[in-house]
Design a protein with these regions (language model features):
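Short, charged, solvent-exposed linker or helix-capping segments at domain edges/interfaces
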Residues: 126, 184-186
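Small/flexible residues
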Residues: 163, 183-184
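Two-component histidine kinase transmitter core
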Residues: 178-182
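Two-component histidine phosphotransfer core
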Residues: 1-164, 170-174
Length: 186
């Protein structure tokens, strides 16, 4: 809150906004809840993206599509931010006017998928093959590694991250997990 009020006092609304968003992300990260609804996860993701858009003004746009039918799905908390962070840091790679897209849907087997894609240069072929066969290593891709480990820990070896290059350009990282709806609360 101190940073937020310093930003307000000095007429720098970006500092105030970043402090508020960061505080919300930190509160969620220290919460004992292991699972959240997709809606809650997307709210935190929007806060993270807001911070990054202040950090990299005008450098990228983002879209989120397909999420409406799945907003009540239960997912491990804080699994989307590392995927988007990876797309921003590696996919945009000092480019101007990049795009990051988050797409939510259902596989043919009834599983939930959440894809994060960018329009950068894609994954080098050797890295793509390594990621597809054994997943990301903890050396240099710690966020992707952690998300993959979390998904496999909770759901088993059939679930986790999938890696591909886009049809025209960019990388696509997809989290695949069982479709689990949250129980309604009264």
């Amino acid at each position: 809150d101190t940073m937020k009020w310093i930003g307000k006092m000095h007429g720098v609304p970006e500092i105030s906004k970043m402090a508020t968003d960061l505080a919300d992300i930190l509160r969620s990260s220290i919460s004992t809840k292991e699972f959240v609804s997709l809606y809650e996860e997307l709210e935190l993701l929007m806060r993270y993206i807001s911070i990054q858009r202040i950090r990299f003004p005008g450098r990228f746009t983002y879209t989120v599509t397909g999420c409406e039918p799945y907003l009540d799905c239960k997912i491990p908390k804080l699994i989307l931010q590392p995927l988007v962070e990876n797309a921003i840091l590696h996919g945009l790679n000092d480019r101007e006017n990049g795009n990051i897209s988050v797409t939510v849907g259902e596989t043919e087997r009834g599983e939930l998928y959440i894809s994060v894609s960018d329009d950068g240069c894609g994954l080098p072929e050797d890295m793509l093959r390594a990621f597809q066969s054994q997943g990301p290593g903890s050396d240099g891709h710690l966020g992707l590694y952690n998300v993959n480990v979390i998904l496999k820990k909770y759901y088993g070896a059939d679930y986790g991250l999938r890696f591909a290059n886009g049809a025209e350009c960019g990388a696509v990282v997809t989290a695949v997990l069982p479709m689990q709806r949250r129980e309604p609360t009264c």
